[in-house]
Amino acid sequence: MEARRHVALKESVRSIPDYPKPGIIFRDITTLLSDPRAFRRAVDALVHPYAGGQIHQVAGIEARGFILGGAIAHQLSCGFVPIRKKGKLPHKTVSMAYALEYGTDEIEIHVDAVRPGDKVLLVDDLIATGGTAIAAVNLLQKIGAEIVAACFVIDLPEIGGAQRLRDLGVEVRTLMQFEGH
């Protein structure tokens, strides 16, 4: 039964070939988000391992991590912390740079977003190289958070991001995998 649910969820993700460039297959979760049953199943599946646990905050990576993270935080009755691109937060922040295919980018968080020792669940829609997620983990740890796990709807295992997080000692949970880039 559980395997069938994940197949149905996987079918709710639109695949767009050659976007944003030739050879890439873009995995678009907006179709999953717009389907109330699929969205509910995805959120429930991500929440289930942590229900009744001691999660203090859910941290979501901009932008689709906000959608998923907000829903997960609501179900877990805990707070939500946005991790944003640099320059988007109004209060005092701490930032972390990370490598892109060509160049670097930077994410930030409010310095007081979590209290030291808070147990945090990191959420985003997809993990590929893991660069953004690793930067988010480092950023959260820098302000005192304890990372309980990192959760993603989609894993692209050939690219290796989930394994990179595991190699850092972070528990990783994903709902589905797609081959390719």
From Swiss-Prot:
Superkingdom: Bacteria
Catalytic activity: AMP + diphosphate = 5-phospho-alpha-D-ribose 1-diphosphate + adenine
Enzyme Commission identifier(s): 2.4.2.7
GO CC annotation: cytoplasm
Subcellular location: Cytoplasm
Keywords in alphabetical order: Cytoplasm, Glycosyltransferase, Purine salvage, Transferase
Name of the protein: Adenine phosphoribosyltransferase
Lineage: Bacteria, Pseudomonadati, Pseudomonadota, Alphaproteobacteria, Hyphomicrobiales
Gene responsible for this protein: apt
